[in-house]
Amino acid sequence: MTHTTALRTALIAGVSFMTMAGAANAQTSAESEARIAALEAQLAALSGQIAELKAATAASPKDTRPAPGATTVTLSNGRPTIATSDGAFSASFRGFFQADAAIYDQRDAGPLSTDFRRGSFGDAAENERARDMSDGVNIRRARIGMEGKVFSVFDYNMVYDFGGSGVEEAGRVSSAWLQYSGYPVKVRVGFFPAPTSLEDASSFTGSLFVERASVAETVRGLAGGDGRASIGLTASGERWNLAATVTGNTVTTLTYDEQLGFVGRAAYVPFKGKDWMIHVGANANLIIDPAASGPDVALAGGAVTNVRLRDRPELRVDGARLIDTGNIDADGVTALGLELGGQIKNVYAQGEYFNIDVERRNSTLSDPKFDGWYVQAGWTLTGEPRRYNTATAGFDNPRPAKPFNPKKAQWGAVELAARYSTFDLNHLAGGPGNPTLPGAIRGGEQNIVSLGVNWYLNSVVMVSGAYRNVEVRRLSPGGTAFGAATPAAGAQVGQDLDIWSLRTQYVF
């Protein structure tokens, strides 16, 4: 009985244990299934969110900016440029090449004793060439350099030139300057041409003719011009431009006491429409203290401070100058100019008048006064207008709408050009055959009619052809002004001639 009871008790206990274990196992499986279901729901939700993010990313614009600190290299219009991605630093390589060819159509040359045509005073070589100006070719400009930006607010420019007038030169600094551009009024320091006139405001690669009008070029050389030591201020807006520059010597000039000059210019666009505009302006070019030609010895009346006005007949294949005042011992020079220009669609015109007043030094003679003016116009047959540059207040060349490509029947832009200029460097000159009066200056009067065609194949290549009719009326001062073979006082030493020229230009 005892054994039976014990067995029964053991069986009941075993069944109870198995029942309890099964219940526990059933409870654990249910919890696991619930957790798995929850995880699957979370994965499904995450998958949906990822799909939405992919769709949104595909629809948004791509950020193509270079990584911070990266540099970019471009070749816009053939000009290699390296710049940082933020534009704070840049370097652009510049190149300018202008080759001129010319034919001078003159009366046949005779001996100096009977052929009185002359060039500059006291220059035997020019007086020989004035009777037979040299047909040929000349590299007018061959410049290479760099320009760019430093720390966002500084601009710089360095250009070296190997061209010349009549003959090529060994090389010289054309410009080397640094400019702070962080304020509306920009400050520039270095060696650069101050803006002297409307004619000077056009870039030398975009002017209507290959050389500036004679009077504008001469005024430019007083206190401006390439490679002149300068410090200047400029400011401009959509319709106005102001510039003021204090200048010194040019880099190729060696004197005792250097020249001190001032150049100021103001320009304004009073009227402007959709495809037309009017420009007015005024300029002043002053030599405050001319450069000294020797030691400043007080007992001898001080150093001679000469100024000289002369120019070529608006072309430089031959370097001879047909009008020339000679040296004038001066205390200073004041040249004042007025500007007027305008544009209607693809037709443009501009003109300037200049008055030049020279103040003699230590002299009772009258102060000489000279003047000159020009007017010129251009018409682009292919329809592109000249571009008015508000930063310089000047007109630059048209940009071809269809660059030259014969395969596509594209021929670039073609522009017709015309100009009349006159420049009078006479003071108390008197008439032919008359003796030279005290204080008189027989520098001559030059009148030039120019007609031309400019062909802009693209934004970097241009070919320009022109014809000039040159008339120079000039009387000999007598004495030894032209050397041993100086014609008698009052003899005509001017001349008439025709000049044909062709320029090829490449600029990047």
Question: Model-predicted segments: where are they?
Answer:
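Gram-negative bacterial Sec-dependent N-terminal signal peptides
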Residues: 1-25
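Alpha-helical, heptad-rich or low-complexity scaffold/stalk segments
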Residues: 26-61
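Outer-membrane beta-barrel pore domains
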Residues: 30, 72, 130-131, 284, ...
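Acidic-residue sensor for enzyme active/binding pockets
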Residues: 40, 52, 147, 211, ...
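Short coil-to-helix leader/linker segments, especially the first N-terminal amphipathic alpha-helix
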Residues: 48-81, 393-396
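Short, solvent-exposed secondary-structure boundary motifs
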Residues: 63, 72, 135, 222-223, ...
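Outer membrane beta-barrel
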Residues: 77-290, 369-409, 413-431
